[in-house]
């Protein structure tokens, strides 16, 4: 049996079912191209019979994709299979995927049929699909809850009818690894013609075991895993593509399997899917979460600096992330601060490590995470200030509404004795406030990230706005709190401006330090 595991991506079919709004054809094509670069063997890109829009998107993707096999889903009905063929026939390589429910609860309560009738429908569907292609996948929906005798029977008959891939879905995420692995093992032991088809699995994550079930299935003979980028999917989602791909790569020593996935494309593909689908990735998500390669514990940070493999079983670079991240918090040790200062270009003789570290811990206790510009300011000014106040927002007034151009008027104090009143228009009230602040400061700031969260509950809840912005190639962070979201957004932008002002002061001191060294 081959050690190659086929990666069947269904982000654009099963994954899209989790979205509140459908993707456009252009967006689907962007994701399809990304999946092709990633190296997926098969991509299921839609359910052609379900809507004219889905039909057209499948047809468009089928014409454009050259290096992955394009698949369309169909029920075990001739009209569905015909629609799939018509959408897919322009592809260089395609697969028709047809399915029918096989569990007793589905057969009796959903289909209102007997199992024998379902068996006949499945056989006829496979035969009909074989009129169009020799690559036919047959799925036994809710296989995880299907009586094993019935499952063995329908798998054998589907292979006889011409199915080249048999998919065993845990449709409701009900099974656990040893149980699901046992189902796959039983099929290999009891289905006489099973060597004539590839056994696939499609596991949902309702109990958080989709990835574990998929890996166990492969250990028991399955050679295709159906999965989605970021684990997107109905309810709790699907088996995560990036997780199974990196498990198979990282633990090849134990498992012995390979895939065609290019791991260097994982991070980029994950971010694209997240952005286009408007589905944020949780920070602690394995492989692709913001914290996946971040270290905050001082002990862990010290270990990683000494040898990366002390706390990292794979490198961030291996999945397309430029580097790991050592978050500077009150738990960070002296070694980490010294290392970061070296990365920023300072020699050990440029500062007193004990004094800097004491100031750092004091600031970190107040602020939480400390950034590079904070650390440099501590070095030069030895002033622990979690909220620099060069720019101080006195008031903001915004006028906006249907048919009106949003206008913001801001009163701001600058330095010790300057007060400025400025007004600006924008594309909405927050943009108007942003334009006004840019006029006041004369800065050219690009907003990279903008997040709104509620602090508290009810009508008195505070809106917390977190901003990441770029100025002169450097990242700056800002935070604002208010019961008014426009005010909290403005405060966050002012916070960024103050950090930039501090960084400018640091740059002057740094230049003088370099000049002294040269003299």
From Swiss-Prot:
InterPro entries: 2-IPM_HCS-like, 2-isopropylmalate_synth_dimer, AIPM/Hcit_synth_CS, Aldolase_TIM, LeuA/HCS_post-cat, LeuA_allosteric_dom_sf, LeuA_bact_synth, PYR_CT
Pathway listed: Amino-acid biosynthesis; L-leucine biosynthesis; L-leucine from 3-methyl-2-oxobutanoate: step 1/4
Cofactor or coenzyme needed: Mn(2+)
SUPFAM superfamilies: 2-isopropylmalate synthase LeuA, allosteric (dimerisation) domain (SSF110921), Aldolase (SSF51569)
Cell compartment(s), UniProt: Cytoplasm
Ranges where the record places region Regulatory domain: 392-519
Coiled coil: none
UniProt entry keywords in alphabetical sequence: Amino-acid biosynthesis, Branched-chain amino acid biosynthesis, Cytoplasm, Leucine biosynthesis, Manganese, Metal-binding, Transferase
Disulphide bond pairs: none
Binding site for Mn(2+): 14, 202, 204, 238
Binding partners and assembly: Homodimer.
Family: Belongs to the alpha-IPM synthase/homocitrate synthase family. LeuA type 1 subfamily.
Summary of the function given for this chain in its UniProt record: Catalyzes the condensation of the acetyl group of acetyl-CoA with 3-methyl-2-oxobutanoate (2-ketoisovalerate) to form 3-carboxy-3-hydroxy-4-methylpentanoate (2-isopropylmalate).
Protein name: 2-isopropylmalate synthase
Underlying gene: leuA
């Amino acid at each position: 049996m081959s050690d190659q595991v086929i990666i069947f991506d269904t982000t654009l079919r099963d994954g899209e079912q989790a979205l509140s709004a459908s993707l456009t054809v252009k967006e689907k094509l962007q994701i399809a191209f990304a999946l092709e670069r990633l190296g997926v063997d098969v991509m299921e890109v839609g359910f052609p019979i379900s809507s004219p829009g889905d039909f057209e998107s499948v047809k468009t993707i089928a014409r454009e994709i050259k290096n992955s096999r394009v698949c369309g889903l169909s029920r075990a009905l001739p009209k569905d299979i015909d629609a799939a063929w018509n959408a897919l026939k322009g592809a260089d390589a395609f697969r028709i995927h047809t399915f029918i429910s096989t569990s007793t609860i589905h057969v009796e309560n959903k289909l209102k049929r007997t199992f024998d009738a379902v068996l006949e429908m499945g056989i006829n569907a496979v035969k009909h699909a074989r009129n169009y292609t020799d690559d036919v996948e047959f799925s036994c929906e809710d296989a995880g809850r299907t009586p094993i005798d019935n499952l063995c029977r329908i798998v054998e008959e589907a292979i006889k009818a011409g199915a080249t891939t048999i998919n065993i879905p845990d449709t409701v995420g009900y099974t656990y690894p040893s149980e699901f692995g046992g189902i796959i093992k039983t099929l290999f032991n009891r289905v006489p013609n099973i060597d004539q088809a590839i056994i696939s699995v499609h596991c949902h994550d309702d109990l958080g075991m989709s990835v574990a079930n998929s890996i166990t299935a492969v250990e028991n003979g399955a050679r295709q895993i159906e999965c989605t980028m970021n684990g997107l999917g109905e309810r709790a989602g699907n088996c995560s593509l990036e997780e199974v791909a990196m498990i198979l790569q990282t633990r090849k020593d134990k498992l012995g399997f390979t895939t065609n996935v290019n791991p260097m494309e994982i991070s980029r593909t994950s971010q694209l899917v997240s952005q286009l689908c408007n589905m944020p990735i949780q920070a602690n998500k394995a492989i692709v979460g913001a914290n996946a390669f971040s270290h905050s514990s001082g002990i862990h940070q010290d270990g990683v600096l000494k040898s990366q493999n002390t706390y990292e079983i794979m490198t961030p670079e291996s999945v397309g992330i430029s580097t790991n991240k050592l978050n500077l918090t009150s738990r960070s040790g002296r070694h980490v601060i010294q290392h970061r200062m070296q990365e920023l270009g300072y020699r050990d003789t440029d500062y007193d490590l004990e004094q800097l570290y004491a100031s750092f811990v004091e600031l970190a206790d107040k602020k939480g995470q400390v950034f590079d510009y904070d650390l440099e300011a501590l070095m030069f000014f030895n002033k622990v200030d979690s909220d620099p106040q060069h720019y101080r927002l006195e008031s903001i007034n915004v006028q906006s509404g249907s048919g009106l151009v949003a206008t913001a008027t801001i009163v701001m104090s600058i330095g010790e004795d300057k007060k400025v009143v400025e007004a600006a228009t924008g594309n909405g009230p927050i943009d108007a406030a942003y334009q006004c602040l840019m006029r006041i400061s004369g800065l050219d700031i690009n907003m990279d990230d903008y997040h709104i969260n509620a602090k508290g509950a009810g009508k008195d809840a505070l809106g917390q706005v977190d901003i990441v912005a770029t100025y002169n190639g450097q990242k700056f962070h800002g935070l604002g709190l208010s019961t008014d979201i426009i005010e909290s957004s403005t405060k966050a932008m002012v916070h960024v401006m103050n950090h930039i002002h501090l960084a400018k002061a640091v740059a002057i001191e740094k230049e003088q330090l370099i000049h002294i060294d040269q003299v």
